[in-house]
Amino acid sequence: MARIAGVDLPREKRVEVALTYIFGIGRPTSQKILSATGVDMNTRVRDLTEDEVNKLREYIDKTVKVEGDLRREISLNIKRLMEIGCFRGIRHRRGLPVRGQRSKTNARTRKGPRRTVANKKK
């Protein structure tokens, strides 16, 4: 089993698909990596030579931000938005949708389960 960027790639999958198991690499990035390293995208992971695995590993380490580094960068970006107090930062802080979705109804995923409020007696 090939291990790249701390992720074990599934042996039975094609390399193009297997690389997408790494956080931060999707299909387009996977295709760019394979064309840059000269590895055939239809090859199965189990059929990769040690040399090809090393090529992929080096290329990903040098050029693509993946796994922990990417997660850290994303969380730092969100913290920065919250610190400067911009609209997006405020929405993150309050746990509301950030990208302009309606929140009067819906938005339950972001807001969490309903907190029922007792009726006021007359």
UniProtKB/Swiss-Prot annotation:
Start and end residues of each stretch annotated as Disordered: 95-122
Record-linked Pfam families: Ribosomal_S13
InterPro entries (UniProt xref): Rbsml_uS13_C, Ribosomal_uS13, Ribosomal_uS13-like_H2TH, Ribosomal_uS13_bac-type, Ribosomal_uS13_CS
Keywords attached to this entry: Ribonucleoprotein, Ribosomal protein, RNA-binding, rRNA-binding, tRNA-binding
Keyword Electron transport attached: no
GO molecular function, one term: structural constituent of ribosome
Keyword Lipid biosynthesis: no
GO biological process, one term: translation
GO CC aspect terms: cytosol; small ribosomal subunit
Subunit structure: Part of the 30S ribosomal subunit. Forms a loose heterodimer with protein S19. Forms two bridges to the 50S subunit in the 70S ribosome.
Function description: Located at the top of the head of the 30S subunit, it contacts several helices of the 16S rRNA. In the 70S ribosome it contacts the 23S rRNA (bridge B1a) and protein L5 of the 50S subunit (bridge B1b), connecting the 2 subunits; these bridges are implicated in subunit movement. Contacts the tRNAs in the A and P-sites.
Family in the record: Belongs to the universal ribosomal protein uS13 family.
Name listed for the protein in its UniProt record: Small ribosomal subunit protein uS13
Species this chain originates from: Brevibacillus brevis (strain 47 / JCM 6285 / NBRC 100599)
